[in-house]
Every structure is written in structure tokens, then in C-alpha cells.
């Protein structure tokens, strides 16, 4: 089939129509020569241009016919081999060519390409690569001319003016200024005792007793702390006086401080109360030792 089509395409078109065309063209040339002889100055330029056009058209027509004949004679297998032998275009090159085609096509496509160049659209070098986006952001039109100082919340728990960690903090002054809180706590404890006596609900009574016990323990701990500070202050004042007399200073150890605190604590107690406190202390120490022994046995 391919050979027959090639032969058909190769065969030149010879017929009466072709001869008539040639005859007509020659007749027209004779007429034009007669016109030129009548008016030679006007038709010289037109003759030259027509001759040149005919000369250009003849080789173009011959070239196109030759190329068509050559392509028709080539088999599909040869075309496939030629295409396979040609270097393949990468995706990047094809994308760039597409972008260039888009840039060339009209004003709308030009605006789109500009938008892409600015980084408005997300790009990826390949389908496995992460999406690349521009980190540039438009600057806000709002401008801060006068900087307003930031209002920060003041928490007294972490305020150096309130805590003892501050350099200018005076604990004695603070305690004197907030002495009314101790009186307020004492009145609260008295109200709790009255409620415990009046209430008949066992659960409510137990809850009020635990609250009263915690308040009493806090008061005792504060009193013990005050006693420790008072003993240390007395000892320091005594040592200052002795140093002025020319003696060596003596610094109290922690164990010595505890002994003096216990003696101060037992001074205002009766013998029965002292025995009770000592027994409670002994039980506490025994329970602690027992717990430590159990932990050692488990290991």
C-alpha cells in the first residue's frame, strides 16, 4: 500500500488542463508585451517584479514537492528509530518552553507570566520535591510613630518588692504592716470552733475540723520560725558585745539552734506537757526509721 501511494504521489499531473494553463499564461504574456510596447516606461518595473516572483515560486514549489515525496517514501519503522535516537527533552526544558509560549501569547498571558515570576504561585522543581514559596510578605501600612509603653501585669508572688529576695525588702516592716492578718486568722479560727460545736452533720464536722487543724499548724509553724529568728538575733547581739570586749566570735550550728529552740519551747510548759511532746517526737522518729528499714528490705 505504501509503495502504491508513493507512486501515485510521484506521478506528475499531465493533462489538457495543464496545457491549457500554460497556453493561457503565454497568451497573457503576449498581451502584456503588446501593452509594454505601447507604454515601455511604465511597465519595465512590473516586468522585472513578475519575472522575479515566477523565479522564486518555481524553486519553492519544487522543494515542497520533493520534501513531500521524500517523507512519503520513508517507512514508519525508520521514523520511529529516528525519533528514538533523538535526545529527549527534560521536564524543566518543556516547562520553560511552555512558559515562553505563554509569554508570547497576548497581554493577558504576559500578566500571568509576570505574576509567576514575582512568586505568586507555588513552584516545584519536580513532583517529589517540596513546594517552594516566597518568604517575602507585604509590609503593613500601619506605622507606629509614638511607641506606647507596654502595661505588664504585676504578680505579688514574683515581685521582688514583696518577696524576701529583694535587696530593699524589710521583713520586719512588712510583718508590722500586715499584722492585722494574724488577728483576722484568729477570729476565723474562733468562728470555725463555734461552727464545729453547732453542726450535727458528721462529714461537715470532719471537714471543719481538718480546716481548723491546718490553720493551727500554720500558726505554729510561723511561731516556730519567729522563735528561731529571735534566738539567732539574741545570739548575734551577745556575740557582738563579746567581740567588742576582745573575745573570739562563736557561731551557732544548726544542731545547737534546735537545742536552744527546744529549751525555749519547754520553758513555759508543765512536766506532763513536756512528756507528751517528747513521746510524740519519739513516735515520729520511730515511724520514719521503720519506713526507711522497709525500703532497704525491698531493695
Swiss-Prot record:
The keyword Electron transport does not apply. Its main location: nucleus. GO terms for cellular component: 90S preribosome; nucleolus. Keywords: Coiled coil, Nucleus, Ribonucleoprotein, Ribosome biogenesis, rRNA processing. Residues 141-158, 224-242 have a biased composition (Basic and acidic residues). One of its GO terms (biological process) is maturation of SSU-rRNA from tricistronic rRNA transcript (SSU-rRNA, 5.8S rRNA, LSU-rRNA). It is found in: Nucleus, Nucleolus. Residues 1-11, 115-127 have a biased composition (Basic residues). It comes from the Eukaryota. It holds the Pfam family RRP36. Residues 96-106 have a biased composition (Acidic residues). Residues 186-290 form a coiled coil. Residues 1-169, 215-254 are annotated as: Disordered. Associates with 90S and pre-40S pre-ribosomal particles. Belongs to the RRP36 family. Component of the 90S pre-ribosome involved in the maturation of rRNAs. Required for early cleavages of the pre-RNAs in the 40S ribosomal subunit maturation pathway. This is rRNA biogenesis protein RRP36.
